[in-house]
Swiss-Prot record:
NCBIfam families: PRK00132.1 (NF001099). It comes from the Bacteria. GO terms for cellular component: cytosolic small ribosomal subunit. PANTHER family: RIBOSOMAL PROTEIN S9, SMALL RIBOSOMAL SUBUNIT PROTEIN US9M. InterPro entries: Ribosomal_Su5_D2-typ_SF, Ribosomal_uS9, Ribosomal_uS9_bac/plastid, Ribosomal_uS9_CS, Ribsml_uS5_D2-typ_fold_subgr. This is Small ribosomal subunit protein uS9. The gene is rpsI.
Length: 129
């Protein structure tokens, strides 16, 4: 029984994922998916997407530790980590996950604030006279 480790990232959220062959258990920060997310069905589907695409929701156990960012970023980091772990588990899953963009790190992060500006791009109000 081999244990596969993968890391997923999105914005400032990081997900550490351990995947083992099992019966479909999903533990996030020592909680079930429903406890961790509450009633956010769209975000739950985002997390389950790689498992549903590869039809592994009943044949692998996943234990994850997620920190940083908000719920949406954490869910996308978790999805990225699960996808990378499934890819390491069976290379045949790459053909399913890659076209959906699940193995690609989303590199969009918050743009830094520049000096002389109020925010990243917002300038102070201009007065002609």
């Amino acid at each position: 029984m081999r244990k596969i480790y993968a890391t997923g990232k999105r914005k400032t959220a990081i997900a550490k994922v351990w995947l083992t062959p099992g019966k479909g258990g999903l533990s996030i920060n020592e909680q079930s998916l429903n406890q961790w997310l509450g009633g956010h069905e769209a975000i739950k589907m985002k997390v389950m997407q790689p498992l549903l695409l590869t039809k592994q929701e009943q044949s692998v156990d996943i234990k994850a530790v997620v920190f940083g960012g908000g719920y949406s970023a954490q869910a996308e980091a978790l999805r990225h980590g699960i996808s990378k772990a499934l890819n390491a588990y069976d290379i045949a899953f790459r053909a399913i996950l890659k076209p959906k963009g699940l193995l690609t790190r989303d590199s969009r992060v918050v743009e830094r604030k520049k000096y002389g500006k109020r925010k990243a791009r917002r300038s102070p109000q201009f007065s002609k006279r």
